[in-house]
A protein has these predicted regions:
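Generic detector of well-ordered alpha-helical segments enriched in charged/polar residues
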Residues: 45, 66, 70, 83-94, ...
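Conserved AAA+ ATPase small/helical "lid" subdomain
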Residues: 72-149
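C-terminal engagement/docking regions of AAA+ P-loop ATPases
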Residues: 139-208
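Short, Lys/Arg-enriched charge-dense amphipathic segments
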Residues: 23-39, 84, 104-108, 141-151, ...
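Canonical AAA+ ATPase core
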Residues: 2-83, 89-90
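Conserved NTP-handling cores and scaffolds of large molecular machines
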Residues: 21, 48, 52-56, 72-76, ...
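A broadly tuned preference for mixed-charge, low-complexity surface segments
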Residues: 33, 38, 42-45, 51, ...
Length: 208
């Protein structure tokens, strides 16, 4: 919460928008490239809890496109209800149990090595951020009366919390789901569990 070393005491939320950065992945795909968009520095990307891709306008449903055309560019009027949703979510977030946090910490811990093996390592800062994001998304789902459980919230936070997106990396859902399933299998296992010992071994020769 600092800019050039100056503390911003009233800062609560921060976000930014950027065009998709040029990368080898984007150049290989048949997609429009933004020549002036540069990948974010890893340290800067790590300071954003979520790196979310906005769909192309053509990918929206007909109804959503109509809504954008009808209301796009207008200043929102009246109470959108967002403040109330945030307050309710913050209340539910505080109620996150120690057992839930224990599960979340174990889950994030089990992501570290598979992500490194996949070439997408995360820092300690990102790991802590994922822990907070999972709890926040879980509370948000409860506020919105959605069907997603804690495991589903974990995948959403994991999928949209990888900082490499800000460097132009393209992720395949199948690979992310495979890593997610590996982490789920390892959560709660005793330290001497064969599965946990295999997954926790960084040396490929010893793992065999």
């Amino acid at each position: 919460r600092r800019i050039q070393g100056l503390l911003l005491e009233s800062l609560r939320f921060r976000w930014s928008a950027m065009n998709p950065p040029i990368s080898l992945d984007s150049l290989e795909e048949d997609t429009e490239s933004y020549q002036g968009s540069l990948p974010l520095d890893p340290a800067l990307a790590d300071r954003f809890s979520y790196i979310v891709e906005i769909p192309d306008f053509s990918e929206f449903s007909l109804e959503v496109r109509r809504e954008v055309l009808s209301r796009g560019g207008e200043i929102p009027k009246g109470d959108s209800g967002l403040k109330g949703l945030l307050e309710e979510t913050q209340t539910l977030l505080v109620q996150t149990s120690s057992a839930e946090y224990c599960w979340i910490e174990d889950y994030v811990n089990q992501l570290v090595l598979p992500l490194k093996k996949a070439g997408w390592p995360i820092s300690g800062r990102r790991a802590i951020g994922l822990k907070r994001s999972i709890a926040a998304i879980n509370a948000s789902c409860r506020t919105l009366n959605r069907d997603e459980k804690l495991q589903d919230a974990a995948f959403l936070a994991f999928k949209w919390g990888l900082p490499q997106r800000a460097r132009g990396t393209r992720f395949q859902d199948s690979k992310l789901k495979a890593i997610h399933k590996l982490a789920l299998k390892a959560v709660g296992k005793p330290k001497d569990s064969p599965i946990l010992r295999i997954q926790s071994e960084s040396n490929s020769v010893r793992r065999i």
